[in-house]
Amino acid sequence: MMRKLTCYCSVAALVAGAGFAGNAMADEQRIADLEERLEALEADPATGDGIRFGGALRFNARYDDTDSAGGQASRDSGGDIDFDTFRVNVDGRQDNITFAAEYRWYDGRDFLHTGWVGYDFTDTTTVRLGQQRVAFGLQPYQSNNFWFSGNYYVGFEDKHAIGLALDHQAGPLAIDAGIFTNPPAGLSGDSFHYSTGVGPDSDREDETLAHEEQNQFYARAAYTFDHNESASTEVGLSGMYGELYNNDTRDEGDSTAYALHVNGQYDRWNIMAQYLSYDHDPDVSDGFSDDVLNMSIEGFNYAAPAEADVITFNVAYDLPVEFGPVSNLRFYNDYSTIRQKSTDDRSSALNVTGMAITAGNIYTYVDVIRGKNMPFVGAQGYALQGDSDVRDDWETIFNINVGYYF
């Protein structure tokens, strides 16, 4: 339903969406950091070498109050509690060689989440080859909640792809670059893979739904200003250029995107802001629209604007507590809006107000998810199906996601 991955990837994000898995947000990164320290102690004390195993089991409770068939069914039943995700992961190191792999099972589908091999040239420079998270904009996530932000639904949050990436840390300056030749690996069908992106619909009836991301180059630079021991501000710039392959005509278009972001940590407060602009220029035959592209994720397909601006603003507050196993509460409000460039009257918005609860190995999201013309939040789609479907109504989903990490 979004600061880079280290060589030890014990806790990764879980996918958002209607009826499919949720995501692990910024608080969950803290769990990952703690796991990494524990794993380092368990590894060879002299070299840090070793192999570590982990996983997670998650369940989801949801009450859908949207104006949709799913919303009506949810109201009739008083809500639903369902299996969300089971995953296993392994990562490790042998001298300068590192690796990580993760596989996930959802309800009726499963696929590879992560699978890469890396090499540490120095303590500050690493390369990785394989399926991995793409560094673009706010990292590792552009939201705090279970449902992600609008960036996720247009393919720019928690994005994974297959390619070669380089990370370099020069004091307060972090530089990431990579070339990603293919979308994430899937087992069956064009859209059965982790991570959202432009992809073909296996059941398409026209070439508007035939495009696929290929040979994408990403670059990101971020600088952190340390104000004092408990306050810092990161500012960053990201860019992307890539190809859009038409599986029907075998012609190629192109894609460009850039993002400016600020991520501030001020004692217990965290503020994230980002402006992202992207332009997909697909090559289509006469008579077919180039204003809309098909997005694919975990077997789901939906329409998204070919060109849009995405604005994100999030505020979060951490409250340490001592209440049984509960050690921290994170309160947050995440807001994002997607504005289609080709028309002024089509926009989408997502606002999530919630709380993340840390209790030992259990991590819980309690969210009020409100969407306007957002996929998986109501019946009206993505404000792209024609003027009659563009509505200003906000739809609401109440969601609780509970996960046990081991």
Where are these regions (language model features)?
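Solvent-exposed loop segments that connect transmembrane elements
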Residues: D67-D76, G186-E212, N247-T249, D281-A304, ...
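Predominantly the C-terminal beta-signal and adjacent terminal strand-loop region
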Residues: A359-N399, G403-Y405
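Outer-membrane beta-barrel proteins
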Residues: A43, S74-G78, W105, V117, ...
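Outer membrane beta-barrel
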Residues: A46-G70, R75-L187, S191, N215-Y218, ...
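Membrane-embedded beta-strands of outer-membrane beta-barrel proteins
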Residues: F86-V88, G115, L164-L166, A219-A221, ...
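N-terminal periplasmic/intermembrane-space "pro-region" immediately following the signal or transit peptide
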Residues: R3-G17, G22-R58, Y63-D67, F406
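Detector for outer-membrane/organellar transmembrane beta-barrel domains
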Residues: Q214, Y223, N228-K341, A349, ...
